[in-house]
Design a protein with these regions (language model features):
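Secretory targeting and sorting signals
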Residues: 1-32
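N-terminal hydrophobic targeting/anchoring segments and the immediately downstream early-domain regions
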Residues: 29-353, 360-367, 371, 384-394, ...
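Catalytic beta/alpha-barrel core
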Residues: 374-381
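Short hydrophobic/aromatic-enriched beta-strand-loop microsegments
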Residues: 397-405
Length: 547
């Protein structure tokens, strides 16, 4: 999940600022409501390549059901609704009138809690979805279907939770207990699968298939469908928060929680996210954003982030402010006070490292994940925690490790690849994504390689913006999908609204194929080859964990 909006949310609250048209013929399910078309023609690729590999691209990190997270009132719209698109894609009632009360949308989109937006959703969408609209639904199922039809074959749906954000945000309909939120989001994902099945004619017939093993995923992809993996990105999994340095969970709770998540179908997991918890210290956010999120760490744990100066030539965390001045003058006394549970948001000059690494409970969780053949998500761990986690994985020769959205020190990439793990990039704009792909590939050992993206859709982070200069060198519609040449992709249309990646970037999930095709025009066949092998490499990595 993106750091920027979480920080902005805490900043506003802690500072006290509160003030193509419809398909005419329904699918086989009796009484199915009409849904938007995709603008993609042709039959999606099924089977394998001549070398026996599956072909398709990978989203390693998105949040389909985050509309139920954080109390269930922060995000507007749903990825599906039994009553159809008009019911699913409508604005939050609390955004009326004219978006004036939508202080969080206004703040994250325009930099001020004061503003307006046109609240109309389907069928006109005058203001949202948009690449920079963070509180409106980005993953409607027909938009995901467009991406699948154009070549996507794996999607990791990260169930997301953050107790502190839920408790601070004033509007809510759901519990703030993180495990309750994860259970609800897993249930909603199953309900979406069943909804798509009904539209396709019955159980198992839909294109959206939740999978629980690499073998099952490979079978689904060979059928030409989308394999959906459940992951977890929670700030206090299993209730493992901190209270003035004391853990609020036990090994028994961790074991019980892992068993429950595994039974829910979860196969990939983070052990910490945004705030220090009883399992590990986090990788900091920087600058003014980090200052505000640091306040959230204090609200949630009773302590501010704790950082020492460390070498810039070794893995480290992002710098945090304020640094220097009093932070340098009082560095010694501040270190001494830590032993008495007293912290202050003052830091030394230079490179910063979180003093908190992987705790004994965190080691227990990592070992428990390995025992259950789950994928360990390295992102969001402090450099110290990530180093210890990688050491545990190396000692066990365990390949199930992933950096899914550019939130770990790049110096660890070689160790991830050395284990047989996988790396994906955050969904940056086209040119930044290409640069990350090139840097990451240069760190690979030269063997079989595939790459993916972590779009972080519905993670309250921006989607890829329009490419600068696109007006001079645009993606031309319609185009043949570079991932699946058997299909042709035209502009995406939902209701009365038509989107164009050249002018709007990735306004919603349906424009992912356009973003990929545009990058293919910029970087050529090599990036298309590597993205088309994203699904295969993910399955190989996952498969090695189960042997």
């Amino acid at each position: 999940m993106s750091r920027r909006p979480l920080v902005l949310l805490l900043g506003v609250l802690l500072a006290g600022v509160m003030s193509a048209g419809l398909v005419g013929v329904p699918a086989a399910g009796a009484g199915a409501v009409p849904e938007p078309s995709t603008g993609v023609t042709g039959v999606p690729f099924a089977g394998t390549t001549p070398s026996g590999e599956v072909r398709g691209y990978l989203d390693a990190h998105s949040h389909l059901m985050s509309y139920e997270a954080f109390g269930g009132k922060l995000m507007c719209g749903k990825p599906f609704d039994e009553k159809g698109v008009a019911a699913a894609l409508r604005d939050c009632p609390d955004h009326e009138p004219h978006g004036v009360p939508a202080w969080f949308e206004n703040f994250t989109r325009h930099g001020t809690p004061f503003g307006t937006h046109d609240t109309r959703g389907y069928p006109d969408f005058p203001s949202w979805p948009a690449a920079n609209s963070l509180t409106h639904q980005q993953t409607y199922h027909a938009w995901i279907e467009r991406s699948w039809r154009a070549g996507q074959r794996v999607l990791v749906n990260q169930l997301v939770a953050n107790r502190v954000l839920c408790e601070i945000y004033p509007l809510k309909k759901n519990a703030c207990d993180e495990m309750d939120s994860l259970r609800l989001q897993a249930k909603r994902t199953r309900e979406m699968e069943a909804y798509i099945d009904r539209r396709a004619g019955g159980p198992g017939k839909g294109w959206f298939r939740i999978v629980e093993s690499p073998e099952q995923a490979r079978q689904v992809i060979q059928q030409g469908k989308l394999a959906v993996v459940l992951g977890v990105e929670a700030s206090e999994p299993f209730g493992c928060g901190l209270s003035n340095g004391a853990p609020r969970c036990t090994e028994a709770q961790i074991d019980k929680g892992l068993d429950e998540l595994h039974a829910l179908g979860v196969r990939s997991m983070f052990v910490c996210h945004k705030f220090d918890n009883a399992l590990c210290g986090v990788r900091f956010d920087s600058d003014a954003l980090g200052v505000i999120l640091n306040l959230g760490n204090f609200v949630g744990t009773g302590r501010f982030w704790q950082a020492d100066a460390c070498s810039a030539d070794a893995p480290h965390d992002n710098p945090i402010a304020p640094a220097g001045g009093l932070g340098d003058l009082l560095a010694g006394p501040l270190r001494d006070l830590r032993g008495h549970g007293i912290t202050a948001p003052l830091y030394p000059s230079g490179t910063h490292c979180n003093v908190n690494g992987l705790t004994p409970l965190g080691e227990h969780a990592i070992k428990g994940m390995m025992q259950r053949k789950m994928i360990v998500e390295l992102d969001h761990m402090s450099a110290k925690a990530a180093d210890r986690a990688l050491t545990l994985l190396e000692e066990a020769r365990y390949s199930g490790v992933m950096s899914s959205h550019s939130w770990t020190d790049e110096r660890y990439v070689r160790r991830v690849y050395g284990l047989g793990g996988m790396v994906a990039s955050y969904g940056h704009g086209a040119e930044a994504f290409i640069a990350t792909w090139r840097r990451t590939k240069a760190l690979h050992d030269g063997g079989s390689f595939g790459f993916g993206y972590g779009l972080d859709a519905n993670g309250m982070g921006p989607l890829p913006p329009r490419r600068a200069g696109a007006e001079k060198n645009p993606l031309r519609y319609p185009y043949r999908s570079p991932i699946d040449p058997g299909v042709t992709v035209d502009r995406q249309r939902t209701g009365n609204r038509t989107w164009d990646v050249n002018t709007e970037g990735v306004a919603n999930y349906g424009l992912v194929p356009d973003w990929i095709a545009d990058m293919g025009n910029l970087a050529g066949e090599p990036i298309i080859t590597d993205l088309s092998r994203g699904a295969e490499e993910y399955l190989r990595m996952w498969g090695r964990t189960t042997r």
